[in-house]
Amino acid sequence: MSRVIFMGTPDFSTKVLEMLIAEEDVIAVVTQPDRPVGRKRVMTPPPVKEVALENGIEVYQPEKISQSDDLQTLIDMEPDLIVTAAFGQILPKSLLDAPKLGAINVHASLLPKYRGGAPIHQAIIDGEKETGVTIMYMAPKLDAGDIISQQAIEIEANDNVESMHDKLSFLGADLLKKTLPEIINGTNDRIAQDDDKATFASNISREDERIDWTQSAEQVYNHIRGLSPWPVAYTKLDDTNMKLYAARIEEGKKGNPGEILETTKKAIIVGTGSDDAIALTEIQLSGKKRMPTANFLSGYQEDLVGKELK
């Protein structure tokens, strides 16, 4: 069994870690520090930390690994392999050079497309029909290392970030499991990326979350599902933020962008920049719980038709 240091943070990483624990000797786990979560700001450990502790594996949580005392500790462990999956930090060269089999990353896109921290979100927002997972050697430049293996998966019309996240986390763990024997034996492929074909998926900003109603209905729909259920697209009703969790396209209903054209028992119909509208079917107003739009409409007293979402 190979001695592996694993680095990752969110739920996406846990499936890869669980596979490595079953197949190899995971000698340490590195993850982000515990963070405050929710309205009450409760300090919460990363999902990867919980898996590691359940399996008796030592955990390191440097704020920035390149400036941490943990860096030399990890190098001194003399790992055979470093594996990362959604770790969230670029590793210093001294750490990349430490393992004799190299440092590899499980990335949730078909590189060189969608380098960066939000590849699942961006692929859906862009209306891509497929995405996938890449196993790659790590390099000092973000997501630019040589490709070892890739596997594609379809993005279906009703997929959102949550559903694709789940599919890709299982796919990533499975592809790495298939690829590991070749990496350990030194028989794996090593294909340089074409930097000219690289696209980028930067972390989602607050401004990225806001809906632009002048876009087409298809673009708005992709934007909503590409941010659902996190970090969530939003718009404004009067002066109140409205988060948008689910929607569908209403073909052949044209109106001014952002104008509420009608309400049904289950949806708010909103005009876009194309000849089709968007039906909002699951929402959350500021200070309220997430709910089906039907529940919101049953208790809302004002007439929404004619109001403008901004």
Curated annotation (Swiss-Prot):
Pfam families: Formyl_trans_C (PF02911), Formyl_trans_N (PF00551). InterPro entries: Fmt, Formyl_trans_C, Formyl_trans_C_sf, Formyl_transf_N, Formyl_transf_N_sf, Formyl_transferase-like_C_sf, Met-tRNA-FMT_C, Met-tRNA-FMT_N. GO terms for molecular function: methionyl-tRNA formyltransferase activity. It catalyses: L-methionyl-tRNA(fMet) + (6R)-10-formyltetrahydrofolate = N-formyl-L-methionyl-tRNA(fMet) + (6S)-5,6,7,8-tetrahydrofolate + H(+). It is an enzyme of class 2 (transferase). It comes from the Bacteria. (6S)-5,6,7,8-tetrahydrofolate binds at S109, L110, L111, P112. Its EC number is 2.1.2.9. Keywords: Protein biosynthesis, Transferase. The keyword Transmembrane helix does not apply. GO terms for cellular component: cytosol. SUPFAM superfamilies: FMT C-terminal domain-like, Formyltransferase. Belongs to the Fmt family. Attaches a formyl group to the free amino group of methionyl-tRNA(fMet). The formyl group appears to play a dual role in the initiator identity of N-formylmethionyl-tRNA by promoting its recognition by IF2 and preventing the misappropriation of this tRNA by the elongation apparatus. PANTHER family: METHIONYL-TRNA FORMYLTRANSFERASE, METHIONYL-TRNA FORMYLTRANSFERASE, MITOCHONDRIAL. NCBIfam families: fmt. This is Methionyl-tRNA formyltransferase. It comes from Staphylococcus carnosus (strain TM300).
